[in-house]
């Protein structure tokens, strides 16, 4: 092994992994941190890596690329995994893996490493991404190789090797946290008992609905070709738009869920997720589609969505089948343009209006007071033909 690129967060796990790689492979380690909106102190991460004698440190702001090229395409499909999960962690891994391989090529590294555990989905997502971008890359997964099997053993290793362990880490925080611009997730520790209610003081993006404002807030989101581009008629970049929706949704307790999900490797996992902006976007996008998509096109999208969601959850972002589905989904968005008005109040998102220059909604046809060009007697033949199998079964 000549050189290794490590996906590095500066937390306890990857700080220990950095030292472990240096010791066990006796080669140079390059660190890469993707800024996806997790609000970490990037300068502190750089200093911590430098203190471990790392010469090449890549800390890159990928927020706009993350939202534009990964989050928005996923939301065009109204993607939800197992009815609730908006895939905030899953959708971040393909971008990190892609850029990690690019840095490996740039620096002449012949291996990459990650800090995902041997029980989780992320090891699969990262490594599928690596091999999709470079089939010949060597992959190092320390959690599947070393003898450090607990958080206490990591802390002892860190202390032994002079690695700074923040006080909150040493005192074992109750949850394992993953964050980016789309969501924040909490897993492990007390959440491992699925019957115990979480301590919601852990939340970082939102207040719980009970503590949210007593006054509802109305907002408008504008869409073009299926993607949001403005809030209240103010154009925003993809990352800034999602960030603004997080702020708005967070103060109204939007998008807090507590779920047990089925991991790809077969383990059930309980987690709490905050996705305020994404939850608002999901409601808004479905609303604008409701007046701009033909019925059969809308139903076809609903049929393929679970398959598309499973591909992303299981780490298959770079596959041919995901790209095929994406092409179909993207084509469906050609006329998904317009404005959606929403009412936010104590954890709920209510669509209260939608309008589009491409609207397929006909007031004359829908009205109880007007028939338009619809003849009520035509329904008789329609019913008789479509009920043949029911009357003859």
Curated annotation (Swiss-Prot):
Binding site for L-aspartate: 117, 121-122
Broad class of the protein's primary localization: cytoplasm
Enzyme class of the recorded protein, top EC level: ligase
Matching SUPFAM superfamilies: Adenine nucleotide alpha hydrolases-like, Argininosuccinate synthetase, C-terminal domain
Location within or outside the cell: Cytoplasm
UniProt GO cellular component terms: cytoplasm
Matching HAMAP family: Arg_succ_synth_type1
Record-linked PANTHER family: ARGININOSUCCINATE SYNTHASE
Annotated protein name in UniProt: Argininosuccinate synthase
């Amino acid at each position: 092994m000549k050189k290794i690129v490590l996906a590095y967060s500066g937390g306890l796990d990857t700080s220990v992994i950095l030292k472990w790689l240096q010791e066990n492979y006796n080669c140079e380690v390059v660190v890469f941190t993707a800024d996806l909106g997790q609000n970490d102190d990037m300068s502190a991460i750089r200093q911590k890596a430098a203190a471990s004698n790392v010469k090449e440190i890549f800390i890159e702001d990928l927020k706009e690329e993350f939202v534009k090229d990964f989050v928005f395409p996923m939301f065009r499909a109204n993607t939800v995994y197992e009815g609730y999960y908006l895939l905030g962690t899953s959708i971040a891994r393909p971008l990190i893996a892609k850029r990690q391989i690019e840095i490996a090529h740039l620096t002449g590294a012949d291996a990459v490493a990650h800090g995902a555990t041997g029980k989780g989905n992320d090891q699969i997502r990262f490594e599928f991404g690596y091999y999709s971008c470079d089939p010949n890359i060597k992959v190092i997964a320390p959690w599947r190789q070393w003898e450090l099997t607990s958080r206490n053993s990591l802390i002892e290793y860190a202390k032994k090797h002079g690695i700074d362990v923040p006080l909150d880490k040493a005192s074992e925080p109750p949850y394992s946290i993953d964050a980016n611009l789309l969501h924040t997730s909490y897993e492990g520790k007390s959440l491992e008992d699925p019957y115990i209610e979480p301590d919601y003081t852990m939340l970082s993006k939102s207040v719980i609905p009970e503590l949210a404002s007593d006054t509802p807030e109305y907002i408008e989101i504008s869409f073009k070709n299926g993607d949001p581009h403005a809030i209240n008629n103010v154009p925003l970049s993809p990352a800034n738009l999602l960030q603004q929706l997080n702020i708005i949704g967070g103060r109204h307790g939007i998008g807090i869920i507590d779920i047990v999900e089925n991991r790809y490797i077969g383990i059930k996992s309980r987690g709490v997720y905050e996705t305020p902006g994404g939850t608002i976007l999901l409601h808004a996008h479905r609303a604008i589609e409701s007046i701009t998509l033909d019925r059969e096109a809308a139903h076809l999208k609903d049929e393929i969505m679970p398959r598309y969601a499973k591909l992303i959850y299981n780490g298959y972002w770079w596959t041919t089948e995901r790209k095929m589905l994406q092409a179909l989904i993207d084509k469906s968005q050609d006329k998904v343009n317009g404005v959606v008005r929403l009412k936010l109040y104590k954890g709920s998102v209510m669509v209260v209006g939608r309008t589009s220059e491409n609207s397929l909604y006909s007031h004359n046809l829908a009205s109880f007071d007007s028939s338009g060009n619809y003849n009520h007697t035509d329904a008789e033949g329609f019913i008789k033909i479509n009920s043949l199998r029911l009357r003859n079964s």
